[in-house]
Amino acid sequence: MPEFSFSKSFNFPINQVFDWHKSDLALERITPPWDNIKVVKREPLTTNFLKDGKIILEQNFMPLVNLKWRLSHQNYVEGKSFEDKMISGPVKSWVHNHEFIQESKNKTKIRDKINFSHWIKIKKLDGFTLNSMEKSFRYRNKIIEHDLSKQYANTNGYYVVVSGASGLVGSDLVPLLNSLGYKILILKFDENSTNLETIQVKSIKNKEIVSLNWNPYSKVIPRIPKEIAEKVKFLVNLSGENILGVWTKSKKDLIVKSRLHTTRSLLSFIKTNSIELKTSIHASATGFYGSNKDMKLDENNSPGIGFLAKTTNEWEKEQNNFLSCSKRNINLRIGTVLSSKGGLIKLIKAPFRLGLAGYVGNGNNYINWILLEDLIRIIERSFHDKAFSGPVNAVSPTPLKSKDFFRVIAEKYNSKIFISIPAFFPNLISKELVQEIILSNQKIIPKKLLRNEYKFFAHTLDKALDNIVGI
């Protein structure tokens, strides 16, 4: 039976390293994007999930092919070890042992051992599996090291209110916050809610994650228990209709309404519950700047022209009303978010993998991008870093012309064909959208991030893609 082993030492006490693995969403946090695994169901049998909990995972192996994994935790020894054993799944057997070894007072080694077997004995298949696990564990340990270095810094049992938690950004942000020791109050969008429902406890450990159905279009403002309201100190507003799709009048109205109205509703929620925020953070967009050919743009530039610029400008004005109940307010002007789970990469992944890649127009317009992992780290850092206030450009410091941007992606996916698509064809579908999103020319500088020495997880597009398709 093949055996995989991986060891890594961390400069942290053994109790801190072990306890990090107890966080409810640790698995979501450390699972590499390219493994395409999501948690379907947890069955916590005790307050310590690692002791005897069961979990069902779904792995997207290829288009339209999803593999189910059913695993249980066993052989738990507090502060020393635990195991995951596959009950059923795509391989014949799978047992993962996690061992924690105290090397000194402030140094701990994690030793992972996985014994597995496939239904068919093929050396190349075993080799492929071993290589894949090597990549995955290198990524896992980078995440663990980062989170341990930030863990429990000024959290004090504070709650973070998150709206839009099920979206692309929120679904990665919540596991990060959970792993760092924050408690989380998720406002779950529900247009049928009366806003009179009570809080639902998602975590069985000391109400670490709670959820509340929220209808921002209702006149009734939801109320939360005073003991939770007093602990709410941060807010992350990620609500808003997806801007992709044909820009009909009704679609554009929904884009505007979903942003302005939900932001007003959030403010009413905060004020009604007498919440005193330390920091409020809102998703904004680089669309604020409009299209500015060959001009470097930073947070000091004025809004541009066009539908997105106008909408974003109005949106930020609504966001700034939070200064009445928050010590700091941040408009996070987010660029093109790179993730295999959604957004641009998910849209183009299939044709690029099939060997057909390209770009629209002459390819000279700049694309301002950011890796999802960097974006969620920036959000968390903004909770406490007083240097971040007002507009903050959440983009990589290395924007690329679209022809270069898509060429790098094509090379990662080994695309054999790389073409230029005349803008005439997509313009036939939605010219305004094409001009404002696909062909918009902005060269945006993350001035505040650079000035305050934010260290990018992925400084270059090549590095970002390594963390999407596999390092």
Regions from the language model: what does each represent?
Residues M1-T47:
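Hydrophobic ligand-binding cavity/cleft-lining segments
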Residues E28, K38-S88:
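Glycine-rich portal/gate segments that line the openings of hydrophobic small-molecule binding cavities
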Residues C325-K327, L338-L347, S382-V392:
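Glycine/proline-rich active-site loop of Rossmann-fold NAD(P)-dependent oxidoreductases
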Residues Y158, D385-E432:
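Mid/C-terminal beta-alpha module of Rossmann-like enzyme folds, strongest
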